[in-house]
Structure formats: C-alpha cells, structure tokens
C-alpha cells in the first residue's frame, strides 16, 4: 500500500453548450496537445452532424453510444508459478466510461471520412446502433474474458 495520501478526484466542469460533465470529459479525451478549443469544435461539430443526419437529440445519441461501448469485464495478466494467465476481472464504473471514450476516439481517428467531426459523428452513430470499430473492440474484450473464464479463480 502506498504511504502517500489518496489524491482527491478533481471536479470536471460541465461543457458550456449542453451542461454535460460526460461530454466535457469526452472533449478532454479528444484533445491533443492541450488544444481544448479545437477539441470543442470537433465534438460540437460531430454533434451538429448527428442532429442534421438523424434528426434526433445528439446528446442522447452520444450517451447511448457510450452505454453500448462500455465494457463489463476485461482481462488482466497475472503471473502464477512461471505462467502468465489472462484473468477476467470486472471493470469499475469510472474505468468503463474512460475505456469507452478512449475506444470511441481511437475508432473515429481510424475512419476514412475527410474531417474529424465527420469521423466522430459516424462512429458515434454506428456505436449507438451497436456496430462500428468501437463496438468491435468491446466485443473482442468480452470474448477474451469469456475465453479465459477458467482462470477467474486467480482474481486479484
């Protein structure tokens, strides 16, 4: 156990347009090299594209996409007697959201559309419908956990 004191979680200010803390956190995941205004423009642009194409509430679509991507279990490496086992463990809620956001941004960056807002909008809409690269990543993680269920007694 570390002897230092436990660092308190910093309060994240909600985003200015929608007043959503989750969206503000997502903007921080999109941000590169500390350029927050650029990440805001990308995220708001993506949400505008979603509203334009779907005619639905873009924030609801975004939250539905995040819910679909959130993993329930993941595997962690555990070394036991010279062998390394992939042990399935439950993911705590804060990490679920962080992983979902990371996977969503990574999948959007790998897409083929011209602009980042278009890529992000496409990935969010796909994830809301239960498809896309971010959903595939979640399914792969769940499949790995299912395949290694036999080692779950090596819990941490």
UniProtKB/Swiss-Prot annotation:
UniProt xrefs under PANTHER family: RIBOSOMAL PROTEIN S7
GO biological process entries: translation
Role summary: One of the primary rRNA binding proteins, it binds directly to 16S rRNA where it nucleates assembly of the head domain of the 30S subunit. Is located at the subunit interface close to the decoding center, probably blocks exit of the E-site tRNA.
Keywords, sorted A to Z: Ribonucleoprotein, Ribosomal protein, RNA-binding, rRNA-binding, tRNA-binding
Pfam families: Ribosomal_S7 (PF00177)
Cellular component annotations (GO), alphabetically ordered: small ribosomal subunit
UniProt subunit comment: Part of the 30S ribosomal subunit. Contacts proteins S9 and S11.
Family note: Belongs to the universal ribosomal protein uS7 family.
NCBIfam families, sorted: rpsG_bact (TIGR01029)
Protein name: Small ribosomal subunit protein uS7
InterPro entries on file: Ribosomal_uS7 (IPR000235), Ribosomal_uS7_bac/org-type (IPR005717), Ribosomal_uS7_CS (IPR020606), Ribosomal_uS7_dom (IPR023798), Ribosomal_uS7_dom_sf (IPR036823)
